[in-house]
């Protein structure tokens, strides 16, 4: 059974989108405190997601992480003992991929957020670069988040966990997710032997390849980290023109073909 897992208590957001849920990193280790300056902890209507700072005023997360009350925390490592330079913001404006008013779990799971106030770069806060080109198959990439570290139990860590996974042939994901379109604007990534994966609590977080954000956590298997069940990530490169247009002030930007 496949589900889109929104973090924390697996609460169901009452949105115009479809039913959703989130993910967390299984099989990883504690992230280095100085190597995730772009990572955002998102609290939305009592549910947890991840996100990525892409410049001092803008961030990316998954569309299914949307909610009426969103709190965005930057510069965080330990949730119990926050860094002194932690900063908190709320959305000033949220933008969704505008080809369709309806959310689908295979496409359009991307949300661009303009912050109510720019964040200040600091020891633990700095943006991550947008992609210059898409990742190739077998590229080693990094996942991270405060999601559950158990594939079957809700065990949420105090600090984010990181793991390395690979870009996988899209055909592998289509075999497990029969609704996935052949030309879907997504990436398939994971470890085919199993053991490392996103899980509950990681939705919206980054897939980082060669120092750039290439994916946004969208859909995974249940339980997490099963063999031959990679996860699906929104492909940031395929949304790059839209992202840049919105940031430049063209809020009527349409989807690329």
From Swiss-Prot:
CDD domains listed in its UniProt record: Tryp_SPc
GO biological process: proteolysis
Similarity section: Belongs to the peptidase S1 family. Snake venom subfamily.
InterPro entries: Peptidase_S1_PA (IPR009003), Peptidase_S1_PA_chymotrypsin (IPR043504), Peptidase_S1A (IPR001314), Trypsin_dom (IPR001254), TRYPSIN_HIS (IPR018114), TRYPSIN_SER (IPR033116)
EC numbers, comma separated: 3.4.21.-
Principal subcellular localization: secreted
Record flagged with keyword Cell division: no
PROSITE patterns reported in the protein's UniProt record: TRYPSIN_DOM, TRYPSIN_HIS, TRYPSIN_SER
PANTHER family in UniProt: KALLIKREIN-1 (PTHR24271:SF47), KALLIKREIN-RELATED (PTHR24271)
Subunit structure: Monomer.
GO MF, any single term: toxin activity
Signal peptide as annotated in the record: 1-18
Glycosylated residues in this chain: 102, 120-121
UniProt organism field: Trimeresurus stejnegeri (Chinese green tree viper)
Subcellular location: Secreted
Protein name in UniProt: Snake venom serine protease KN9
Pfam families recorded: Trypsin (PF00089)
């Amino acid at each position: 059974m496949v589900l889109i897992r929104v973090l924390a208590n697996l609460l169901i957001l009452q949105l115009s989108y479809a039913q959703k849920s989130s993910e967390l990193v299984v099989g990883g280790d504690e992230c280095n405190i100085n190597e995730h300056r772009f990572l955002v902890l998102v609290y939305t209507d009592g549910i947890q997601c991840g996100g990525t700072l892409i410049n001092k005023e803008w961030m990316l997360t998954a569309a299914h992480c949307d909610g009426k009350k969103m709190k965005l925390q930057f510069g965080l490592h330990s949730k119990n003992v926050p860094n002194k330079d932690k900063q908190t913001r709320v959305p000033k404006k949220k933008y969704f991929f505008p080809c369709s008013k309806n959310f689908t779990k295979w496409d359009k799971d991307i949300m661009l957020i303009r912050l109510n106030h720019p964040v200040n770069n600091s020891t633990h806060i700095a943006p991550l670069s947008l992609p210059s080109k898409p990742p190739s198959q077998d590229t080693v990439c990094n996942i991270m988040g405060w999601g559950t570290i158990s594939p079957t139990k809700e065990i949420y860590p105090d600090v984010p966990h990181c793991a390395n996974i690979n870009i996988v042939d899209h055909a592998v994901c289509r075999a497990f997710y029969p609704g996935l379109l052949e030309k879907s604007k997504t990436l398939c990534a994971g470890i085919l032997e199993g053991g490392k994966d996103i899980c509950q609590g990681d939705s919206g977080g980054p897939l980082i390849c060669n120092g750039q954000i290439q994916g946004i956590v969208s859909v995974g298997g249940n339980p997490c980290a099963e063999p031959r069940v990679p996860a699906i990530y929104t492909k940031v490169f395929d949304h790059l023109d839209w992202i840049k247009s919105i940031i430049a002030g063209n809020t009527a930007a349409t989807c690329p073909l």
